[in-house]
Amino acid sequence: MEVTDDDIKKMVSSLADRLYTYAHFLTEFCIKVTQRERYGQKDKHFFYTLLFKATNELTAVGVLFKNFYEKAALQGGMYLILRTVLSDCLAGWHVSRMRENGEDFNYMIDLIHFDHVNFSIKSLSGPYNQINRLPPQELEKQIQSIKSANPAFFHSTVDDCGKTIYRNDIFNGEFYSLKRTITYLTQQKLNDEEKGLLNHLFYYYDLFSKLEHPGMLTFMLVHKGFDPRLQERSLIDVAEALLAIEPVLYEYMLNWPELLEHSTEFHKALKNLHIEARSLIAALKMRPIEGQ
């Protein structure tokens, strides 16, 4: 049976609706978590933050996906949002697997959180200072201000006047990077399903990153939404990225199993999301696709 253009457009609209419903249930779940203050522990606070962030981002993706054909210029924004979700999923999976293995996952959470602090200090003492030429005393004052706002990340001493002076960070030069996460996850004993998941998470993160950072492929990517030959490949990319993201978000939710026990409507929404995404992928793969 031939799959027509109208069939594909209807399936895209249906998947967008399923994604919106799924994101709505995620929002309700996050509200329940905050109402009961069930994220006091460092790991729960970390996973809640990633879940709520992803919920907002997927809500936006749903709106953009709904307008896939009507507003081609929106497609680039959709890819950039998905890139962020995929990156967070990899970091979240890293921490989750460390916790499962009985490793010091709190250290990894701290290292991830420290990234903003570390970058602020390096930017202040590097590019920002090159632009603004701060006097040395003012530069040190601002660096100390950043450190004093995040004292847990730094060694400190007290001077003769009783003033706390913050010195080197506690990580001894270590820093978080996606490369670190990929190295860790590839060293784990992953089953075939997990290997496939890791492959899709990184593949689509890497693909969408080519739009985030200008390079040889950027020209093609910024025009992809306007090229009918490439649009269907884009639809597959988005659907497969969503299927890779969902299992990681569900793992975050398992931090609050009592909130999932009687969520029959949520599981129905989850099932429908999978059905629509896989149906769209299957239908598109029945058609000749440029770049497939």
Place the predicted regions along the sequence by residue.
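Secondary-shell segments that build the walls of catalytic and ion/ligand-binding clefts
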Residues: 1-48, 113-242, 246-292
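Intrinsically disordered, low-complexity coil segments
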Residues: 66-73, 100-105, 188-197
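Short, glycine/acidic-rich hinge or "gate" loops at secondary-structure transitions
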Residues: 73, 97-108, 258-268
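Internal, hydrophobic cores of structured domains that mediate oligomerization or house catalytic pockets
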Residues: 77, 82-133
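Long, hydrophobic/aromatic-enriched structural stretches that serve as scaffold segments
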Residues: 36-97
